[in-house]
A protein has these predicted regions:
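Edge strands and adjacent loops of beta-rich recognition modules
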Residues: 54-94, 162-177
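Extended Lys/Arg-rich polyanion-binding regions
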Residues: 107, 142-177
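Beta-strand-rich interaction surfaces with strong enrichment in secreted/lumenal proteins
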Residues: 86-89, 99-103
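Generic structural hydrophobic/aromatic packing signal, biased to beta-strands
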Residues: 28-30, 46, 98, 114, ...
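Short Pro-Gly-centered flexible turn/kink motifs
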Residues: 102-118
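Residue-level preference for beta-strand/loop junctions
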Residues: 94-96, 108
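Polysaccharide-binding surfaces and accessory modules of carbohydrate-active proteins
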Residues: 1-81, 123-156
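Hydrophobic residues positioned within well-ordered beta-strands of beta-sheet architectures
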Residues: 12, 98-100, 112
Length: 177
């Protein structure tokens, strides 16, 4: 349960196993159930690259290796330029991090898209990873999300700037229809 996860976060993390899928540049994380009646949850994190890549995709699922000894999120060792470790499996404190070096010519264009989701089966996680590894699928999804957001804003009678005020918690002065 959520309350058990909050009470014992380290214990809860012991039930997460990570796996890298090279064919779709994705990490999937399966949370092993603690009880027979508990459903299994799967997270998927996938990278899509539209442009010229340089070298292989790198990944990290161990927070301690990502941060480094004595370092924190503001200055992780992962940003020092060294290759990521490629750790997977049952890690003590799981994260998902994908990295791809790119080559960008002067005036060139490269689009990197990261998609993250939660599903209830490994098969669904694999399907999402395969689908969103395709740059055109990621671009279509972002375009559809933008279109839906614009329709919602029109329906509410607010501008995108006013919507941003809501997101930032500054909604006192914004009135809708």
């Amino acid at each position: 349960s959520v309350s058990e996860d909050l009470t014992h976060p380290v214990f809860s993390k012991l039930f997460v196993e990570t796996e890298y899928l090279p064919e779709s540049a994705a990490l999937i994380c399966g949370r092993r159930p603690r009880a027979p009646d508990e459903p299994r949850a799967w997270a998927v994190h996938v990278l899509s690259v539209d442009g010229r890549m340089q070298g292989p995709v790198e990944w990290e699922t161990d927070r301690a290796r990502f941060l480094g000894r004595g370092r924190g999120p503001e200055d992780p060792v992962a940003l020092d330029g060294r290759p990521l470790s490629g750790t997977t499996g049952a890690v003590l404190d799981p994260i998902v991090s994908l990295r791809q070096r790119i080559r960008l010519a002067p005036g060139g264009f490269v689009r990197l898209s990261f998609s993250t989701g939660m599903v209830t089966t490994r098969e669904s996680a694999l399907a999402i990873a395969q689908k969103y590894h395709d740059p055109s699928a990621a671009a279509r999804t972002f375009a559809l999300a933008f279109t839906q957001t614009q329709g919602t804003l029109r329906h509410l009678g607010i501008t995108s700037e006013e919507a941003q005020l809501f997101v930032n918690g500054e909604s006192r002065g914004v009135k809708t229809k």
